[in-house]
């Protein structure tokens, strides 16, 4: 009798393992990239009726994927906290100067631990040097463990602000290498910098330039046989900017007004339906949970939820 019970339990366990493996084979995605366009207001991007500042993202690319029209930053609306929410799946008040590490582990650490890959399999490439804090955590069980590679700032050393064209050149170099990163976040800063400089014309020009960068990034993915039909691209923001009439308007951000909280998300990839617009609210913490699901690693510290419309296999 005990033998029969043992065999029954063994069969049940094997069936569960087989089902889990079958679920894992469903996703075509093997590479995941996140492009963060730093600090545009929704009213100048997808919310602009004629799409004149982002003609590619708002039109042709939007039709190639699933667009979240009511995507939010529901935490502190600053650069480091916003990026931290994306990669950890948690909101926290953290220094925006890059002088403190996030409190929770991130997608890169969970991914590297789960896969056993070396640090170059996961990357943060950022125009803002302070974003090199994204790959580490102050969590005592994870601090300095499974730390991804970084190239942040003008010389990749985590100091200062670099030019977006240099950041994109580094991104291009990595994508065209023999072994592209499997998981990567890219930050482009110009929109945010010119907003803070109160330079409206340059702010708008930078939105258009990042539109071109986004299109070029997707094009490079499609032209690379290793990445084509195996890569999901998330295009999003870390925060918006004050609405007109709120404090200093587009010049700054950091409050909980709709302008600061309303950001965008466009998901492109082989597992994602085309031409779908999601109007229900989702938030930036959902990105981490979704990436964990499609790349098959556990991320228990993330507070996000799976973006099911973009990945309807589950």
PLM features per residue range, with description:
Residues 59-102:
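Active-site segment of extracytoplasmic enzymes that catalyze sulfate/phosphate-ester chemistry
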Residues 135-154, 169-212, 216:
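Active-site His/acidic residue clusters
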Residues 93-159:
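Catalytic-site neighborhoods of secreted/periplasmic enzymes
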Residues 81-88, 252-295, 313:
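Substrate-binding rim/cap in mid-to-C-terminal beta-strand-loop elements of soluble/periplasmic
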Residues 32-36, 43, 67-71, 85-87, ...:
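Structural recognition of the beta-strand scaffold that forms the well-ordered cores
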Residues 33-34, 211-251, 291:
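Metal-dependent active-site segment of extracytoplasmic phospho-/sulfohydrolases and closely related
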Residues 21-65:
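Active-site-proximal N-terminal segment of extracellular/periplasmic enzymes that hydrolyze or transfer
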Residues 1-25:
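Bacterial Sec-dependent N-terminal signal peptides
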């Amino acid at each position: 009798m005990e033998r029969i019970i043992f065999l029954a339990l063994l069969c049940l366990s094997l069936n569960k393992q087989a089902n889990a493996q079958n679920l894992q084979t469903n996703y075509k995605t093997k590479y995941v990239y996140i492009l963060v366009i730093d600090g545009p207001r929704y009213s100048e991007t997808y919310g602009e009726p004629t799409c004149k500042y982002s003609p590619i993202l708002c039109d042709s690319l939007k039709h190639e994927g699933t667009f979240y029209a009511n995507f939010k930053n529901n935490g502190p609306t600053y650069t480091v906290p916003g990026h931290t929410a994306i990669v950890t799946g948690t909101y926290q008040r953290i220094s925006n100067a890059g002088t403190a590490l996030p409190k929770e582990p991130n997608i890169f650490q969970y991914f590297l631990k789960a896969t056993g890959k070396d640090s170059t399999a996961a990357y943060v490439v950022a125009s803002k040097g302070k974003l090199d804090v994204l790959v580490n955590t102050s969590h005592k069980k994870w601090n300095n463990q499974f730390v991804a590679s970084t190239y942040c700032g003008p010389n990749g050393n985590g100091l200062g602000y670099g030019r977006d064209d240099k950041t994109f050149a580094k991104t291009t170099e990595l994508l065209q290498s023999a072994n592209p990163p499997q998981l990567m976040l890219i930050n482009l800063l110009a929109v945010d910098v010119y907003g803070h400089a109160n330079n409206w014309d340059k702010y708008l020009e930078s939105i258009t330039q990042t539109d071109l960068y986004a299109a070029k990034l997707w094009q490079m993915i499609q032209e690379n046989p290793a990445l084509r039909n195996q890569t999901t691209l998330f295009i999003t923001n870390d925060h918006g900017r004050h609405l007109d009439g709120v404090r200093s308007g587009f010049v700054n951000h950091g409050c909980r007004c709709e302008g600061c909280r309303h950001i965008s998300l466009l998901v492109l990839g082989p597992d994602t339906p085309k031409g779908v617009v999601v109007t229900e609210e989702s938030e930036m913490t959902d990105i981490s949970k979704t990436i964990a699901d499609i790349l098959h690693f556990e991320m228990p510290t993330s507070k996000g939820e799976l973006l099911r419309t973009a990945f309807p296999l589950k």
